[in-house]
Swiss-Prot record:
Organism lineage: Eukaryota, Discoba, Euglenozoa, Kinetoplastea, Metakinetoplastina
Region of interest: Disordered: 231-255, 348-370
Lipid positions (GPI-anchor amidated cysteine): 452
InterPro entries assigned to the protein according to its UniProt record, in alphabetical order: LRR_dom_sf (IPR032675), TAT_signal (IPR006311)
Record propeptide residues: 453-476
Sequence repeats: 107-130, 131-154, 155-178, 179-202
Membrane topology listed for this record: Lipid-anchor; GPI-anchor
Name of the protein in its database record: Surface membrane glycoprotein GP46/M-2
Stretches the record annotates as 4 X 24 AA tandem repeats: 107-202
PANTHER family: RECEPTOR-LIKE PROTEIN 55
Gene Ontology CC entries for this record: plasma membrane; side of membrane
Range of residues in the leader sequence: 1-32
Location of this chain's protein in the cell: Cell membrane
């Protein structure tokens, strides 16, 4: 039976559960012994495409050297293909065009997850990505990617999940995407789209679309109509189809639509290439701007180290960085040391940056995720007495939570947090999930800290980045 890697986003109790799938093969999922597990053609063509990403994201180019891509950071090789998983990074870069001299049937890239780059990733969605016939999961959530949805992506015959929430995308929703035979998840909320969800999307079997309600209402076509792309008086903006105008394309244009972080003037008509960076930034060969990282060194997942668990409840702080669990008071268990929720679990949204280290867009996105997590986990536990919930967090892992609220006078909540290692499966409620190994379990005893096992073949994360606190009704 196929071993699947799924990312589940649980909304409010009456909302639909969104499953992000990565079904890698019909054989047991296993990390390939190395690049040599692939054929010569697969090695050559996959390497060429990965090198295109390394050129577009300079920090990757510094480490992605040689030809043994299975040994590169942020890459996981399975027997059936390759996954690129960014985590705990402050890289900047753009989305590359796909190389022309590649046989894409031998490009074994199954998943691309660049969500952790946040506002450091800019550019537009390249139509040439339609060539990646094996791509199953694409996650660009929360990045600065802009432009429109390419109709050409309908040629992605293996695509199952496209996670494009909270970017800078605009335009209409392409009808042609409904022709993707395996597409199951399209997440588009938090963008600037116009028009309505196409009828062909609504009619497609098992397609789950996440987008604002005004794109689906009865008056959508009148209230949210798309305007013409060309404004009056701009007929001269489209250059003739000649090849003798190189000077025009290299002339900086100080337009306000530049999408490169830290850029003062974009290059020509491209919003994804910079000609001159602002003070404090330097221009790279890829026409991006490098400056002070959005998160200082020492931040990220490590910053949440030392988070504590408390049988009596959780102390929760809401700040600019989202939801954070207070550390010191959680060990003593003294009355009043920390507020006790009725039932449920509180998740720390990782990594919670310090105040002032994120822009307003990042803070808004974090608050939205905090609200979704709390409503997804705490509310069902209160309403139904027993809740099994799966939720997605910003680290490349999935947490399964089974919550049993206290019953009577002496029974306490039992919370089991299972961290995905992308190997094997475990049942989470009635739905299959890849929660393979138990990260931490504390039915009655107090723990001073959380210690996670190795996640997906060697990459280690702290439990504090996943689930940090278990709430319980007081005994007696």
């Amino acid at each position: 039976m196929a071993q699947c890697v799924r990312r589940l986003v649980l909304a409010a109790p009456l909302a639909a559960v969104v499953a992000l799938l990565l079904c890698t093969s019909s054989a047991p999922v296993a990390r390939a012994a190395g690049t040599s597990d692939f054929t010569g053609a697969q090695q050559k063509n996959t390497l060429t495409v990965l090198q295109a990403f390394a050129r577009a994201i300079p920090a990757l180019g510094d480490t992605w050297t040689g030809s043994d891509f299975c040994s590169w950071e942020h890459i996981i090789c399975y027997s059936s293909g390759v996954g690129v998983w960014m985590h705990n990074v402050d890289y900047t870069g753009t989305l590359p065009e796909m190389p022309a001299s590649v046989d894409y049937k031998d490009v074994m890239i199954l998943a691309l997850d660049f969500g952790a780059m946040g506002q450091g990733l800019s550019g537009t969605l390249p139509p040439s990505w339609s060539s990646m016939k094996h791509l199953i999961v694409l996650d660009l959530e929360g990045t600065k990617v802009s432009g429109t949805l390419p109709p050409e992506w309908s040629e992605m015959t293996s695509a199952e999940a496209l996670q494009l929430e909270n970017c800078g995308l605009s335009g209409s929703l392409p009808t042609s995407w409904s022709s993707m035979p395996k597409l199951r998840i399209v997440s588009l909320s938090g963008n600037h789209f116009c028009g309505c969800v196409p009828d062909s999307w609504r009619e497609k079997d098992r397609l789950d679309v996440t987008i604002e309600e005004w794109h689906m209402g009865e008056d959508c076509k009148l209230a949210n109509a798309c305007r013409p792309t060309a404004a009056p008086g701009t007929t001269t903006t489209n250059p003739p189809t000649t090849t003798g105008t190189p000077a025009a394309s290299s002339t900086p244009s100080p337009g306000s639509g530049c999408e490169v972080d830290g850029c003062e003037v974009c290059e020509g008509d491209s919003a994804a290439r910079c000609a001159r960076c602002r003070e404090g930034y330097s221009l790279t060969d890829e026409k991006t701007c490098l400056g002070e990282p959005r998160w200082r060194r020492g931040g990220g997942v490590e910053r949440t180290a030392g988070c504590r668990c408390c049988v009596g409840g959780c102390a929760v702080e809401r700040g600019a960085g989202g939801v954070r669990v207070r550390r010191a008071p959680l060990l003593c268990g003294a009355p009043g040391a920390c507020p006790r929720p009725r039932h449920g679990v509180v998740a720390a949204l990782s990594p919670p940056p310090a105040d002032g280290e994120t822009d307003s867009h990042t803070r808004t996105r974090t608050r939205r995720r905090a609200s979704r997590v709390l409503s997804a986990v705490v509310a069902p536990a209160r309403m139904h007495g027993h809740a099994e919930a799966c939720m997605r967090v910003r680290v490349p892992a999935l947490v399964c939570l089974s919550v049993w609220p206290a019953v009577g006078t002496r029974r306490r909540s039992n919370v089991r947090a299972a961290a995905v290692c992308r190997l094997g499966q475990r049942r989470c409620g009635a739905r299959p999930s890849p929660c393979a190994s138990v990260c931490v379990s504390w039915p009655r005893e107090r723990r001073t800290e959380c210690a996670c096992p190795a996640l997906f073949d060697g990459a280690r994360l702290r439990c504090c980045a996943l689930v940090v606190c278990a709430g319980a009704a007081p005994a007696g």
